Amino acid sequence: DDTPSSRCGSGGWGPCLPIVDLLCIVHVTVGCSGGFGCCRIG
C-alpha cells in the first residue's frame, strides 16, 4: 500500500524519513516513497 496513511503517522502529518523535519511543511502528494517531505493524512 502506497497511500499516505500507510506511510505516515496517524497524527496527520508524518515524515517520509526517520529524520523528522521540525517544520514539516512540505506536502508531498506524489512520490512520498522518494523519501522526502511529509505526507498529509485526511
UniProtKB/Swiss-Prot annotation:
It is found in: Secreted, Extracellular space, Extracellular matrix. Its main location: secreted. Disulfide bonds join C8-C38, C16-C32, C24-C39. Keywords: Antibiotic, Antimicrobial, Biomineralization, Disulfide bond, Extracellular matrix, Secreted. One of its GO terms (cellular component) is extracellular region. It holds the Pfam family Pelovaterin. GO terms for biological process: biomineral tissue development; defense response to bacterium. InterPro entries: Pelovaterin, Vaterite_Nuc_Antimicrob_sf. Induces the nucleation and stabilization of vaterite, one of the crystalline polymorphs of calcium carbonate. Exhibits strong antimicrobial activity against Pseudomonas aeruginosa and Proteus vulgaris. This is Pelovaterin. The lineage of its organism: Eukaryota, Metazoa, Chordata, Craniata, Vertebrata.
